[in-house]
Amino acid sequence: ARKHFNNEEYDIIRIPNNPFSRVVIPEYIRKRKSLPIDAIKRIRDARFDNPRTAMARDVFMMLFYLMGINMKDFFSLANETYGRVEYRRSKETTIDNKSYVPLSVRVEPELRPLLDYYSNGTFLSYFRMRYTDYNNFLKAVNKELKLVSKQLGLGVQLSTNWARHSWASIATKNAGIGKADVDFCLGHVNNDFKMADIYIDIDYSICDKANRAVLDLLKKNE
């Protein structure tokens, strides 16, 4: 408004003061969506009468076992290759910058029975046979995860994002994994080294060790 009504070049000042000078815009603080180890174990071990709720819990645990893979990438998984799940993180894949982030996750023993259960001839075909697209799948799973949280008394609005945040938090705080390695496992692009990454072979053993360390924490005091 001041730019519209004022013209400092001709000393025309119709609005002398800035009405927003005392307005303080609060800093955006991202809400934490991480669960402690005990809560993850409770989700894993819970029994649900409703098969849809049990399915949502299984999806949550698969996301966690796959180092916090996001739901869009999970729904798009097509196969398993020599005991590994490989994909390119869709969030960082753009036509403009070609920032493809290839990830490879070793199938750990905790994940194996779930993959087998939901693969009927074709890898994870169970979900694609029942849900027409990713958005319907996401909506259905998140709806049931709210019931999981309510039944277990977790006190949070549980959603699929919590699997990713929880894996990262446990890896850093409990498993002692360095932040740089956690970022690598999550598929975060490092713009400072993007060109160097083109020429460097990716060492996924970093991910294997980190994920194994996190999953081993779920086995303690069982």
Task: Give residue ranges: language-model regions.
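Short, charged phosphate-coordinating catalytic segments
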Residues: 2-11, 63-84, 180
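Basic, Lys/Arg- and aromatic-enriched nucleic-acid-binding interface segment
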Residues: 12-18, 22-71
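Active-site/catalytic core of tyrosine-dependent DNA strand-transfer enzymes
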Residues: 40, 106-155
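Short, leucine-enriched amphipathic alpha-helices that occur as contiguous helical runs
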Residues: 55-57, 138, 142, 164-165
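C-terminal catalytic core of tyrosine-transesterase DNA break-rejoin enzymes
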Residues: 61, 65, 69-72, 162-188
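Conserved tyrosine-mediated DNA breakage-rejoining catalytic core shared by Y-recombinases
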Residues: 66, 75-114
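Short, polar N-cap/turn motifs at the start of nucleic acid-interacting alpha helices
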Residues: 80-86, 155-156, 176-198, 219-222
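Catalytic-site neighborhood detector that most strongly recognizes the C-terminal catalytic loop/helix
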Residues: 91-94, 186-219
